[in-house]
């Protein structure tokens, strides 16, 4: 088994909504339970910066900066020992592990919950392009279009209906970005990444289990 960590991360780690604590505790639990031959791939900040261009080439366009380059370097290191791997990618999407499944401001945001700050993103556009592109209008259109496809049961509570909407958006938008990232960063290194949590049979089953049984 393999995991990634960063030099001085133990000294400088600061919790966020996405990562309230270090992964190391849970990695140790996994390794102890499964008794695996575990390897930690250590990366440093200069490495991440240097790999940004390769990560952009792998994706064919600018992507998620160090989120991409860290994945690219991780795959490069693991490729020294194997050509195929299983990952936990998509578990949070399938089982509702992200903070936006629980935070009221995200559930009631009226937009894609992982990108609520639309005006800040608009400022990243070239001023000439920004004059021609109404980013919020386009996002609102795609958001409402996506919600038309959400399958709701007659027995669903109001809370369950809202979480179904969030799940649908996460599976069809956010998860697709991560799958594309994994595939491109892996194959750039000749490394195949498989995602068992994304098995359609598991996804279909988990869609209808009670939320209390999810994350």
Residue ranges: model-predicted function:
Residues 1-156, 161-166, 173, 178-215:
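ATP-dependent adenylate-handling active sites, centered on carboxylate activation for C-N bond formation
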């Amino acid at each position: 088994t393999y995991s990634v960590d960063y030099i001085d991360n133990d000294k400088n780690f600061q919790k966020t909504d996405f990562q309230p604590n270090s992964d190391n505790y849970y990695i140790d639990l996994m390794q102890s339970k499964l008794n695996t031959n575990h390897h930690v791939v250590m990366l440093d900040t200069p490495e991440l910066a240097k790999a940004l261009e390769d990560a952009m080439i792998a994706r064919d366009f600018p992507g998620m900066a160090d989120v991409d380059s860290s994945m690219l370097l991780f795959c490069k290191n693991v490729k020294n020992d194997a050509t195929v791997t299983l990952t936990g990618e998509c578990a949070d999407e399938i089982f509702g592990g992200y903070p936006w499944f629980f935070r009221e401001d995200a559930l009631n945001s009226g937009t894609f919950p992982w990108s609520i700050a639309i005006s800040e993103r608009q400022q990243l556009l070239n001023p000439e392009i920004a004059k021609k592109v109404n980013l919020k209008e386009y996002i609102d259109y795609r958001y409402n279009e996506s919600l038309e496809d959400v399958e709701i049961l007659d027995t669903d509570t109001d809370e369950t209906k809202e979480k179904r909407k969030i799940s649908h958006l996460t599976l069809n938008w956010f998860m697709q970005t991560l799958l594309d990232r994994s595939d491109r960063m892996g194959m750039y290194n000749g490394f195949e990444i498989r995602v068992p949590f994304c098995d359609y049979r598991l996804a279909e089953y988990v869609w209808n289990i009670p939320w209390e049984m999810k994350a």
